[in-house]
Amino acid sequence: MPDNNVGRVVQVIGPVIDIKFDSDCLPNIYNAIEIDMGDRILITEVEQHIGDDVVRTIAMESTEGLKRGMKAVNTEKPISVPVGSEILGRLFNVLGKTIDEEGEFKAEEYYPIHRPAPTFEEQSVEPEMFETGIKVIDLIAPYQKGGKIGLFGGAGVGKTVLIQELINNIAKEHGGLSVFTGVGERTREGNDLYYEMKESGVINKTALVFGQMNEPPGARMRVALTGLTMAEYFRDQGQNVLLFIDNIFRFTQAGSEVSALLGRIPSAVGYQPTLATEMGALQERITSTKHGSITSVQAVYVPADDLTDPAPATTFAHLDATTVLSRSIAELGIYPAVDPLESTSRILDPRVIGQEHYDVAINVKHILERYKELQDIIAILGVDELSEEDKLVVSRARKVQRFLSQPFTVAEQFTGMKGKFVPVKETVRGFKEIIEGKYDDVPEAAFLFVGSIEEALEKAKTMS
């Protein structure tokens, strides 16, 4: 490497490092810089040119032990991460280094994490439903193959459990590959997920990339791009890939921290002025091409349950389907706590899912909507004051509400109930028969935590 490619650290403020280079070889924006700290090499990424031949960089690892005057080498390329079948079953950090202590790792190919989105000509636009085996999702807010799905919910309503169940179902039922990206979430949850996936064997179809809560903001901001780059490789090889991002809010949050550290004036609610640009650069790369597809499921933490906050609101603009988890449904003991009235999907359309499925979904929504309207009357006057017609609506709605629950495979150890994968045809048939009144005489408790309608009837027999 030529000597004039070497700079010196001139200022360190937490994770922000200013480095002075010769004027004729300033590194490009997004180039990776290596700083030799003796016991380790620290990688930083160029974010700004601030004049006087100084570049401002963000560290991807802890800056502990860093001193002014240390040598910094311009690698002349962005951070590059391993791609290919070798990454399956392994656990990586933002730089593409393995952190699972499972021995030596070698990859044939490396891709830079900053890449252009596919062109219009390359993109595919054929809508097709993606079967998840989770009743409430398949019926009310079906996922599109190659679409972007947002999982919305406050703290502790079950986003991560739902993501784990989806990984499990995709691997077992579709034989599909998944890339799980943990962005700024708890290390303990990542650890639990890793060992659960090892136990169930799902790990061999999955690559995991973690940039957890305790890491510098640079790592949390870039780790989503690392996971996406790995998924893009599989897509370009003709695979249908699932990309899980848990949590996309932490991507925005890390961007906000970095923005403040770089001295940008904040915008609404203290977020970075480049919020929409950063989100767009990530989301536009998640798409289907003529070769394969990336279906992305993104958990979105909603600060203080406020959907108008700029972070979730910006995310909404990019999504094809939303799965909203509701605390009020979780309080009823119904899991997954998906709100059927708040959750939406672009492909809830008879041309994509078929007329029967569409009609049943709309009728289920209608009956639950009516039940919601009647709840105020019930709270004041009691059920007995309702008309016979409304009593029937309430009875069926409560059965529908309970039938939307389902035991999950990944939660077996907590619930003691065997997880269920329900094909979409069975889901549609079950709900159709409930709202037609076929099971008006079956107790509502029989519909709670079962898979198909047959299981509910079996459960009813044991109850009587």
Swiss-Prot record:
<comment type="subunit">
    <text>F-type ATPases have 2 components, CF(1) - the catalytic core - and CF(0) - the membrane proton channel. CF(1) has five subunits: alpha(3), beta(3), gamma(1), delta(1), epsilon(1). CF(0) has three main subunits: a(1), b(2) and c(9-12). The alpha and beta chains form an alternating ring which encloses part of the gamma chain. CF(1) is attached to CF(0) by a central stalk formed by the gamma and epsilon chains, while a peripheral stalk is formed by the delta and b chains.</text>
</comment>
<dbReference type="InterPro" id="IPR055190">
    <property type="entry name" value="ATP-synt_VA_C"/>
</dbReference>
<dbReference type="InterPro" id="IPR024034">
    <property type="entry name" value="ATPase_F1/V1_b/a_C"/>
</dbReference>
<dbReference type="InterPro" id="IPR000194">
    <property type="entry name" value="ATPase_F1/V1/A1_a/bsu_nucl-bd"/>
</dbReference>
<dbReference type="InterPro" id="IPR036121">
    <property type="entry name" value="ATPase_F1/V1/A1_a/bsu_N_sf"/>
</dbReference>
<keyword id="KW-0066">ATP synthesis</keyword>
<dbReference type="InterPro" id="IPR050053">
    <property type="entry name" value="ATPase_alpha/beta_chains"/>
</dbReference>
<comment type="function">
    <text>Produces ATP from ADP in the presence of a proton gradient across the membrane. The catalytic sites are hosted primarily by the beta subunits.</text>
</comment>
<dbReference type="InterPro" id="IPR020003">
    <property type="entry name" value="ATPase_a/bsu_AS"/>
</dbReference>
<dbReference type="Pfam" id="PF02874">
    <property type="entry name" value="ATP-synt_ab_N"/>
</dbReference>
<dbReference type="GO" id="GO:0016887">
    <property type="term" value="F:ATP hydrolysis activity"/>
</dbReference>
<dbReference type="Pfam" id="PF00006">
    <property type="entry name" value="ATP-synt_ab"/>
</dbReference>
<keyword id="KW-1003">Cell membrane</keyword>
<dbReference type="GO" id="GO:0005524">
    <property type="term" value="F:ATP binding"/>
</dbReference>
<dbReference type="GO" id="GO:0045259">
    <property type="term" value="C:proton-transporting ATP synthase complex"/>
</dbReference>
<dbReference type="InterPro" id="IPR005722">
    <property type="entry name" value="ATP_synth_F1_bsu"/>
</dbReference>
<keyword id="KW-0067">ATP-binding</keyword>
<dbReference type="InterPro" id="IPR027417">
    <property type="entry name" value="P-loop_NTPase"/>
</dbReference>
<keyword id="KW-0406">Ion transport</keyword>
<comment type="similarity">
    <text>Belongs to the ATPase alpha/beta chains family.</text>
</comment>
<dbReference type="InterPro" id="IPR004100">
    <property type="entry name" value="ATPase_F1/V1/A1_a/bsu_N"/>
</dbReference>
<dbReference type="GO" id="GO:0046933">
    <property type="term" value="F:proton-transporting ATP synthase activity, rotational mechanism"/>
</dbReference>
<dbReference type="Pfam" id="PF22919">
    <property type="entry name" value="ATP-synt_VA_C"/>
</dbReference>
<keyword id="KW-0472">Membrane</keyword>
<dbReference type="GO" id="GO:0005886">
    <property type="term" value="C:plasma membrane"/>
</dbReference>
<keyword id="KW-0813">Transport</keyword>
<keyword id="KW-0547">Nucleotide-binding</keyword>
<feature type="binding site">
    <location>
        <begin position="153"/>
        <end position="160"/>
    </location>
    <ligand>
        <name>ATP</name>
    </ligand>
</feature>
<dbReference type="InterPro" id="IPR003593">
    <property type="entry name" value="AAA+_ATPase"/>
</dbReference>
<keyword id="KW-1278">Translocase</keyword>
<keyword id="KW-0139">CF(1)</keyword>
<protein>
    <recommendedName>
        <fullName>ATP synthase subunit beta</fullName>
        <ecNumber>7.1.2.2</ecNumber>
    </recommendedName>
</protein>
<keyword id="KW-0375">Hydrogen ion transport</keyword>
